[in-house]
Amino acid sequence: MATEQEAEVGTETSSVSGRFLRNRDLYLFLPFLLGFSDQESSNGDDDDVASSRERIILVNPFTQGMIVLEGSSGMNPLLRSLLESREEGRPPASKASIDAMPIVEIDGCEGECVICLEEWKSEETVKEMPCKHRFHGGCIEKWLGFHGSCPVCRYEMPVDGDEIGKKRNDGNEIWVRFSFNDGRRIRDFSAQDGGNSDGVESEN
């Protein structure tokens, strides 16, 4: 049975993630950073309690692991500074360019997929980008679906013209999809002001 603290963490995860993530680019520049909790307390006048409840939530979107850290007074300004100083990144790669990547077989078992950090298996089939860097098919397809460049060398994949326009018009929208072990899935968060936790749903 989940403890009161675990339930509280789950609630904070769903409520702050939509407000913290601002766009697809930030999600990729900081792939393990999902969000941090607001400095709120139940009575509104106890600053010590509010500070003690501040948490930073780290998520690996590929392994679906989550770590909750207690925040510090210096972390909040640092993270907000990263948000404000970010530069626009490249839009998602076109579906045609992703589908066109060849499937190759790994000769040996040395090395790893730099996205999920899993080691290659002997005779495993992977996808190879035009820059010759190789990744698990599922990993690189997810990556390029958010950001159209190689995660190793930043080789730029072709993008759709309408995706560029859509990105400029929908700069405040972020789509996130991952699941926790309890069967709940957080997805399709909108970073518009006034967003709520409607993106949390139960899986059957």
Curated annotation (Swiss-Prot):
Record field: catalytic activity: S-ubiquitinyl-[E2 ubiquitin-conjugating enzyme]-L-cysteine + [acceptor protein]-L-lysine = [E2 ubiquitin-conjugating enzyme]-L-cysteine + N(6)-ubiquitinyl-[acceptor protein]-L-lysine
GO molecular function: misfolded protein binding; ubiquitin protein ligase activity; zinc ion binding
Pfam families: zf-RING_2 (PF13639)
Gene Ontology CC entries for this record: cytoplasm; cytosol
Enzyme class: transferase
EC number: 2.3.2.27
Protein's GO biological process: cellular response to hypoxia; cellular response to misfolded protein; cytoplasm protein quality control by the ubiquitin-proteasome system; protein autoubiquitination; protein polyubiquitination; regulation of protein complex stability
Zinc finger (RING-type): 113-154
Location relative to the cell: Cytoplasm
Post-translational modification: Autoubiquitinated.
Record flagged with keyword Iron-sulfur: no
Keyword check for ATP-binding: no
Induction data: Induced by arsenite and the proline toxic analog azetidine-2-carboxylate.
InterPro entries: Znf_RING, Znf_RING/FYVE/PHD
Keywords: Cytoplasm, Metal-binding, Stress response, Transferase, Ubl conjugation, Ubl conjugation pathway, Zinc, Zinc-finger
Function: E3 ubiquitin-protein ligase involved in protein quality control (PQC) under proteotoxic stress. Is essential to plant survival under proteotoxic stress. Functions by removing damaged proteins before they form cytotoxic aggregates. Recognizes misfolded proteins selectively and tethers polyubiquitin chains to the proteins directly for subsequent degradation by the 26S proteasome pathway. Targets misfolded proteins independently of cytoplasmic chaperones. Associates with the 26S proteasome and sustains the structural integrity of the proteasome complex at the initial stage of proteotoxic stress.
Name by which UniProt lists this protein: E3 ubiquitin-protein ligase MPSR1
This protein's encoding gene: MPSR1
